[in-house]
Amino acid sequence: MNRNIFITLLISLLALSGCSGDTCIDPDDFGFIKFNISSRYDPSEVTSRQEGDQVAPWRDSAYKVNGYPLTIMVRPWDYMSGDKNTSGMLSAWCPWYGQQNNFTTLAEFCVRLRPCQFTDGKMCPTPTPRDAPINNAPCILTNGVGLYFLIADKGSNPNMSPDSQRSPKGITQHLGEPVASQDYEFYSISSTGKFLQAGGINYQYGCTSLPCDQASNYAQSSLYFKILDKFYDDNSGQYRVVIKSGVSDTRPDPLQFLTNLIKNELFGTSDKDPGIVRQTYQQIIETPGYRLSVSALLTLYIMFTGFSFLIGNINMTHVELVVRILKVSVVSILLSTSKAWTFFHDYLFVFFVEGLAQILQIVQDASTGQSLLSLLISPQTLSKLFSLLFVDPLGFIYIILYLIALYFIFLLIFKATIIYLTALITIGMIITMAPIFICFMLFNITRSLFENWLRQLISYAIQPIILFVGIAFIGMIIKTEIQSTLGFAVCKKDFPDLGPINQIFGSFTEDLDSSIGNSIFYWWFPVPMKGGIENFTQADILVPEDYTKKDGTKCLAYQCIDKRYIQLPFLDLVKDANRISNFINGKFVQLDGLLLIFVSIYLLSKFNDTAISTASFIAGTSGNLTSIQAVNQQSYDSIMKQVNRPINYATGVISKPINRMQEQTSMFFAEKYQGLMMSRLENKALSSSANKAVQNEVKRKYGIDHKDVNMQAGADYKNGISKLLDNKTFLPKGGDLDVKKLATMNFGQLRDEFAKNKYGAKNYSSLTSDQKLELDKFMKSDLGEKGKSAKSLRELASDANFTRDYQSAYKYAHKEMSGRGVGLFGKNIGVLRSWQEMENRMKTKRELKEQKRVAIGEKIYAGYTGLKRDALTAIVGKDLRDKYEGNLTSAEWHDFDYNDPQLRTYSESLKDKERAREVKELQMQINKETLAVQEDILSPEYLARLKRPSDVEYYQELGQRRLIHEVRDRLSEGSDPVIMGDRFMQEKATDDQMRTMIDNAHQKHAEFIDQDRYTRRQEHYDIMHEKAQENIDRTYKEIKDHFKRDDIKLEEMPALIAQYEREKPIESFDSKTELSLDKRIEEAVSNFNINAKNYEYSASVLNNIEERKQAITDEVNTQIDRINKYRENAKMPQYQKPVENSGRKLRKLEDHLRNMK
């Protein structure tokens, strides 16, 4: 039992160990905003009026200032002290020798240069020259020299034009000016654990105290940065910027996201998105019965007022008259549907919704800094926490107590959020009922109902205010204590120190993450870790917490200066002398501070419990009825659940077989109906009533134009087969064959069937050469009357196959359009179809966005459990890991899913889902390009017609990516997939299973080639190419023999053909033709040009088809090689050769003619 607890705690420590991305963390860093500012720009971003006078845009930090002291620090960097030239460490730049890849690194020449020095120590002396007076160039600039920030005026854009980039509107300050003149200094810990002086600025808007008018005017203004130079093309390097205070934290907060989501759903975001509350409110006041009731109440009220005045029942003073007129006016507004919501929202409801949000924002701003929860769980805080484990005997106890406190704080904050959301929803419900209760204010007998309604509204509005004021107050106590206790610097150290083994991992870990160090094993340790006053340094620094001076002046964080230890900036030298003494003596654990945290947690829990009753007391309502009703309802639901359990069980047992039978019956008729509808669609595709929109979709998605389809091809093919079967010389046993069945086969299948019937062979390939010649003689002979309409069986089969492909494409295009929401009217009305298509694209984008959002959470959790699993394996070994896995590491993420034919783990399924989303995004891109050109951009025909090589490469790249996914999907489908889960292949797959996978890969490769909609067209273009080649060869031979030349070029052929027709003997002409010489020349030249065009076009298409077949083959071989790699790792022999594609590369016409010499 004790061992289980120890392993659980140890794995928790490994899993929660913070990864901040830095080698060392500053003492006051509990989650600062950090980013890099590069000294280089893309050439397209830089403009120049003349050579050497470039201007670059300002970089938007994506943060807005909040009017409090803006404290920005630039990290120091010293190569000679051990800092590395990597994007994670570099904080310097060089104005010389930079290359295009030096956005985040220094040029090699600049790495070892010394920092720049300026004449008289001033970078910008007065009067300011054009160039900084550097006296040791070339050199590197550090500590913020050359870096400026800009607080832009509200509504202005500093990057609107080159002039605005040079002279932006707002506040600009240089971060590289020496801060010694300001009576304070910035210090930061380097990657080697040394405290170095850093650059930076503490800007307080020129105010003696904050807040002030100028600070308020610039609150929520955008913050920009830029390294100022006059020539950026040879710059290299970057600055690492740390924003310590003065900006609104826009980093994601899950609880804030949840509250905003519900609030926007209830109250909307704009007039176009009104929200549930406003919609319900509008529906109530727009109801005719309600308007009639309000009119009747107003009429009665006016009548009673007049009657009471006449009989002297009321004393109509000026005040009473004004009150009654106001009541009538307010209730009368409810009759105006267009103004009712605007009036009551702007003058009443806004105080309970927007006013509540503003008050909560004021409370949060008053607490300053980051939220309590983000501070407690930030990587920097956790890194400092876990650094106590090996430096103090009480470190382990402190960590456990801290985690327990964190758990309770999270529960309390979550509970407070639920209370706030409940209050928000209740306020929405109360506002929804406003049209009813506002009418109750007219009469004395119903006035109490209106007053109670208003009290409830006030009560639920006060609840969150009281709650979050308490959280902010107690949260400040906890934050102050955490900062004081963990306010020291930490650095990563190799732990355990493996000596020479660390060198093995050094280069690998540096490429992976420069912050890891020389080993994949590390831990955080405090700096300085050893006690002694000599390791601590005092200096005048900005106090990083809210602070009260000796004279009673209140200061915000980073507003005032005080002398403190730079290693312990949160501790006052006098007030916190005992804690400072403990740190100097090497005692880092402060248990008294932890006691204060637990006391604060207890107070916070009590405050949560009393917030609702306090708000109810203030508003004058008890608030007990809702709680009693909730308890009664929960008790009732629990009892009824127990009573109904046996009844529900008996009902389920009886209804299960009935439901199964109904489902099977419904499925049977549904399949029959679907088959009937699909058959009707295929027949409709060949009729004159075919839908034009679907035909255009077929052309756009499948590359088949209905104008190229012979609608009678199927009948012609069937007639050709019948005619051939009637020839008893050809097929003595032809009567045994079914013509209808043969008409569904392609030419290759039909030839195999004839070979089997005539010779008794297995297929055509097994015939002898003489038998093949005899069979080909009959099958390739023209079956029609001599002339243009006469075609061989091969041509008829090709046309019929093309027509069947068109029918299938029409059917699937119709189905896809229906799936995208394009209904019957949309298929016939262009405007409606465009609208429905746009809605489908928007829906698809939303679904992909939602899937990505869900996948991010799943991926984070999968990675988290994977980290725990790896940690457990490293500690206890694989065998013991399997024993503890079920309870400790969420094994379901890593176990096989036996319902999955691929036997993947859940984490592997997540990766495949991510690939599926990538396929959807890729398909959306392909659809967009297809829609633009109104053709199938992936078809070999379209690629053959393209003229620009860049377009061909772009579309081929899209097609290649799509084809890889198609092949992988084909290899993953079925009950015996080729692609299995990685863990199964590594640990469980047997020799027989892997052999079966490779055999299936060969089989699926053949099926894919045969069924692919593009490769199926090869026969059609083979025929076109052979006919064109045959005609060209015959013409070329005639010209060659006539002119006795062997060097005829393609461009000479039209002229030589014309000359040949003029010189041709009269005896060679057909007596039946009476064409003139000019007509004969025109026809001969035209025929040659058509044949040449068909030759080139068919050759290009066939080459594209061969490339597609080769790509399919390569991807299948990749998966076979993957399986053989697993076999090799398992010490199994390699099995079966890769799939081969006996492809060909057709020559261009010029090369073909040259080869005929």
Curated annotation (Swiss-Prot):
Keywords: Cell membrane, Lipoprotein, Membrane, Palmitate, Signal, Transmembrane, Transmembrane helix. The chain crosses the membrane at residues 292-312, 394-414, 423-443, 458-478. Residues 1-18 form the signal peptide. PROSITE patterns: PROKAR_LIPOPROTEIN. The keyword Phosphoprotein does not apply. A lipid is attached at residue 19 (S-diacylglycerol cysteine). It is found in: Cell membrane. GO terms for biological process: protein secretion by the type IV secretion system. A lipid is attached at residue 19 (N-palmitoyl cysteine). Residues 1134-1157 are annotated as: Disordered. One of its GO terms (cellular component) is plasma membrane. Residues 1148-1157 have a biased composition (Basic and acidic residues). Its main location: membrane. The keyword rRNA-binding does not apply. It is a multi-pass membrane protein; Lipid-anchor. Belongs to the TrbL/VirB6 family. This is Uncharacterized lipoprotein RBE_1261.
